[in-house]
Regions:
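Extracytoplasmic gate region of multi-pass secondary transporters
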Residues: 1-41, 45-48
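Structural signature of the two symmetry-related core transmembrane helices
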Residues: 65-79, 158
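Multi-pass alpha-helical transporter architecture, strongest
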Residues: 158-181
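Paired small-residue
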Residues: 88-96
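Helix-to-loop junctions at the C-terminal end of transmembrane segments
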Residues: 50-62, 147-148
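A membrane-interface helix-boundary motif in multi-pass transporters
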Residues: 145-163
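Intracellular juxtamembrane helix-capping segments at the cytosolic ends
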Residues: 103-116
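A late C-terminal transmembrane helix in Major Facilitator Superfamily
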Residues: 115-150
Length: 181
């Protein structure tokens, strides 16, 4: 289970940089308040659609495949605003991010349910919660530290995207633990 846990740590580390600093990045790029409000509306629409979009994948994936796919898509969503503030880029980023980020949490619950006996589900979910919390604590600090250097927030977003991509690679290494109990 260690690869899935490491992948989820990187999710916590990477996704939170996007959520913490996206408004600041968009403002730096000259995006106005109206478009930022639209950004959040579109992100929310993606969240509403996400469970419908990913339910089948979460039911079928027994190892870390779902976590890997979702982390990889989040890495792409995090990279997109680095390349500009064109309305289509911003829309693509927020829609992809919204359609994906909460399903990562669901992917860990699905992994636990597919791989551990019911008596161990609480402990399994607790382990994922702990590594996620650690990532959420460390992620904004590193993103902010990177953003304080040359390249500003773009560099911070590159760091977040790299963490998410690493999380995808780590999760992909996670094989099913055995038959569900």
């Amino acid at each position: 289970m260690r690869h899935a846990l490491a992948g989820y740590l990187m999710f916590g580390f990477g996704y939170i940089g996007y959520m913490t600093f996206i408004v600041t990045l968009l403002r730096e790029q000259g995006v106005g308040a109206g478009r930022i409000a639209g950004f959040y509306a579109l992100l929310g629409a993606g969240v509403v659609a996400s469970s419908w979009l990913w339910a089948g994948v979460l039911q079928r994936a027994r190892g870390g495949q779902a976590l890997a796919l979702l982390n990889g898509l989040l890495a792409v969503a995090t990279l997109v605003p680095v390349f500009g503030s064109h309305p289509l880029l911003v829309a693509a980023s927020c829609l992809l991010f919204g359609c994906t980020f909460l399903s990562v949490v669901a992917s860990t619950t699905a992994f636990v349910r597919h791989n551990l006996p019911a008596s161990a589900w609480t402990a399994g979910i607790a382990a994922f919660t702990i590594v996620f919390a650690a990532g959420q604590i460390l992620g904004p600090s590193l993103t902010g530290w990177l953003a304080d250097g040359p390249g500003g927030l773009r560099r911070g977003f590159l760091g977040s995207a790299a963490a998410l991509a690493l999380g995808a690679v780590l999760a992909l290494r996670q094989k099913p633990l055995g038959q569900p109990h």
